[in-house]
Amino acid sequence: MNGGRDGVRYRVLAVGLLLFCPVTLWGADNFRTAEYERNGAALDSINAAEAYSLGFSGKGVGVAVIDATGELNGDEFAGRVDSGAGWISSPWNGAFHGYAVAGVIGAAKNDSGIHGIAYQATLLPLGTTFSSDTLVNAQLNVLDRPDIKIVNNSWGYRIFNDTVQTFSADRQVELLDGIINNNMVIGTEMAKQGQLTVFAAGNEGHLTPSIIAGLPTLLDAYGIDNTLANNWLNVVAYDPSQRPSSAAFIASFSNLGFGSSAYTLLAPGVNIVSTRDANTTDTFSGTSFATPYVSGVAALTSEAFPYLNGKQLADILLSTATPLTGSNTPRAVLLIHKNYDDHQNYLSSDLNVYATGNAVTFSDEEMTVLLARVREDAFFDNLTDEQVRSAIRARASAQNINVLTTEDYQSLFGQGMVNAYKAVQGPGALNAQRLSNSDLNSGTFNGNYAIYGVDTQGYSSTWSNDIAQVKNTTSSSPLYQLDVGLRKQGAGALYLTGNNTYLGPTIVEGGSVVVGKVAQGSGSLAGDVWVQSAATLGGHGNIAGTVTLENGSTLSPGASVGTLTVGNVVFQPGSLYHYEIDEQGNADGLNVTRDATVAGTVVLDAPSQSLGDRFTLLNVGGTLSGSFDGLTSNSTQPFLQDTLSYGNKQAYLDVVRNNRAFNDVATSLNQRAVAQTIESQNSGPVFSAIANSRSEAAARSAFDNLDGEIYAASRAALLQRSRYVRDGINSALHDENAQSLWLSTWANKGQFDETAESSRVNHSGYGFLIGNGSPVGESSTLGVVVGAEKSKIKTDARAASNDVTAYHVGSYWGTGYRGIAWRSGLVYSYLDMGSERDIQVPGLTSRAQADYHAHLFQGFAEGSHRFAFNDSLSVEPYGNLSYAWLDLAGGQEHGSAAALRWERQDSGAGYSTLGLRGEARWSSLSPVRLYADAGYQRRLTPDRNQTRLSFVQGGDAYTVHSATDDRDALLVRAGVTLAIKQNATLLLGYQGLMSDKMSENSANMQFGLTF
């Protein structure tokens, strides 16, 4: 037999002379590396780079290689040789043939040498001497490995289907009982367990494949039951450097597909660079090296669709091949035909030209290629180049050319060139010629159909090719001329995104079928769809026929949210319509171009809805009959419910208010108050926002955010903070600065702790007072004071704050009477306030702001008596009474639909304090004095932490409460007074106020100057 382009010839004799066939998510361009380009023409001709760009490399797929090596060493195969690999025979010197075949399938993509078509596949090499015994044992070995789906066979015999019947009867019996029977029995068992057998057509320049590559045809010819044909592929070689229309495109050494067209594929087999051993590469030609391209594409396809068996892999490869038709048809084929006797002994070679016309004239380019091919055959060694050219021209002349009918000529090329890119996208047709009688659907689903079944076994995958139908044309078959349908079985989702023209029904028996994966994308079915119990139909596409949803089945438009268009729809009782609304309010839809009959249950999947929403469940172009039996929902929204309604040609889902009161979910006083107020509005944006709450917790959070607690908190904090002005005046009177010009400043920070009813209140600020007094009589002082203060009050949990600017003016009086020192003051403050509330409720998100003012009046009186132990130490018990009255002007917020308003309100707070001051100095002459103060403060008036509010949009007024101070608190002070000069003093001090529910800390400084 003619060997590779390197001129190597092989001949092996065994129990019959055996012949092998050696004529020796990036874009696609990202895969065209230097490693790829060493076989760039071959790989590009089968669209390999495009298949790689879809993410496929053969990873995880096992391919058996029955050939001349049982070991694959070197970096090209490291880590991807199956543990079952080994020699069936003793190792021999033909091993490089097996290395080369394995390299075409799965040499690594490692930036070195070459890479195979399925460069991450796992390989199972089984080494033979190509004797019948070793081949049978290798096949039996594969039969014990049902996990290996693809079996590559780059070997064969020099016997052909169209000549075997010319052999003697004894020779025919010998073949039938020997190699034919062995391969039939083993091949049948492989087919039963889902393995795909891929065979080289052979290199004898024959119109038909060798006897084993064409075994299904031979079995049919002898009338032998043939159950292996659908798991069998015959591979013909072509020259990838030539255009398909060229007379030099088909390899001149290759056997073709005549009589075996239904299971024949073409693959590149001329000048293929592959591994020769563990370290080197070489160039090879032959159907031996075309066959692994088909096996490799099968591995890519198996990776894409792990649930497919060998027959189904063959279905895809055959239906997605690029046919040699039209402008792609080779205008002629030159074959170097080798002649053998019935024992495979070589006799001679001759040239044959095949075409559909009466004569062919070859171009110079074609003649150059054809001349080189003929010169490789030793039979023509004695001819000159010109004699070879003349022989080629003579065979192409009108007198000698072999003229075939168009149908017979097309059959030479089988189904066309294997196409990796199309194959990894699913079938291109459902072929009833490749179905069995058991695939007949009789009467069910409204007719008789040939049904193609696939079990996705829990995998989800996409068939994106346009799937046509091929009818059975065998008149004796029960499938004769029936439309072809698809039966989807098993768990997992099957996405159909092509424009599918098969006319039989699509039967969804298990898992889901999604017609159209994305909105505005492709995806259509020409026939009916039947969805059976526990199965689902979805998608964004178009179904021209009738969709019937049986009891227990589900319709779920979209792939998530989307709209499905159908011709007719029938919801049978017990069926489910899964209707989804997403976070943005986009909803499923069903467009029915003709008639709809509805029943069953609508199952709503809606994480959020809005009051008053109306969603269209289906639009009907024809007649709408029936009604849905019920509605279930996963919604947790506490104040809404869904109802069904109908128009003449529509079914609707309406979102309405249920009868649950808003305050049913409230857990605090403030929540209940604001909930009742919002309920009283009956409509409007605030009412709708609460009605649209996703959960009870969300509603409570909304009540908290809307309640305006900052206004109650501000009143409580302002009354509490008023003491800093009183304390500044009192300190000046106590330290005898009141008869001079004095300055008092302070900075402070405090909080009211949160309670079960209200949030934590933080307040802080700083201010100053300037006073001036003069003596009145012998022991009295009268003075005036002015000042200003900045404060910030926050309720962080309510996302609210209030900025306060205060302007103070007042007077003070101090005197001594019968050993008691009396101090008192009166102050008026004008408060300029600006509030902000961040409204964080969905549907109301905004910032509510208000500018408003208030008036604060306060006064105090204190009496104390000083006990001096000596010139250095004294104590002073004291009692203090104070009162502050806050007059809040009316106002309202702006900037939000949830804005609040209020009328004029006032409140007051009175305090009493009993305490003891202590003072110490080193001596009577010391300029430094230390002081400390501890007191018990009691609030004499009730809590003053309420404010009456209402929404600008309307509704009843309500009272909101805030956290406030405790009735009883501990007051502490400490500091130092420095006599700077005879006429100047400086006081630095700390003051704290503490109780269970509040705390305050402040630092103060006072400076006095006497003139």
At which residue positions do the language-model features occur?
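Extracellular S/T/G-rich loop segment that most often corresponds to the catalytic His/Ser-adjacent loop
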Residues: 62, 67-70, 219-303
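Substrate-binding/access-modulating region of protease and related hydrolase catalytic domains
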Residues: 52, 57-59, 96, 108, ...
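Extracellular beta-solenoid/beta-roll
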Residues: 485-486, 496, 503-585, 591-601, ...
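Outer-membrane translocation/initiation segment of Type V secreted surface proteins
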Residues: 307, 319-468, 474, 587, ...
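Outer membrane beta-barrel translocator domains of Type V secretion systems
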Residues: 682-867, 871, 987-1011
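Subtilisin-like serine protease catalytic core
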Residues: 30-31, 36-39, 49-135, 146-149, ...
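Extracellular repeat-rich scaffold modules on cell surfaces
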Residues: 277-280, 287, 293, 300, ...
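Outer membrane beta-barrel transmembrane domains
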Residues: 882, 894, 898-1011
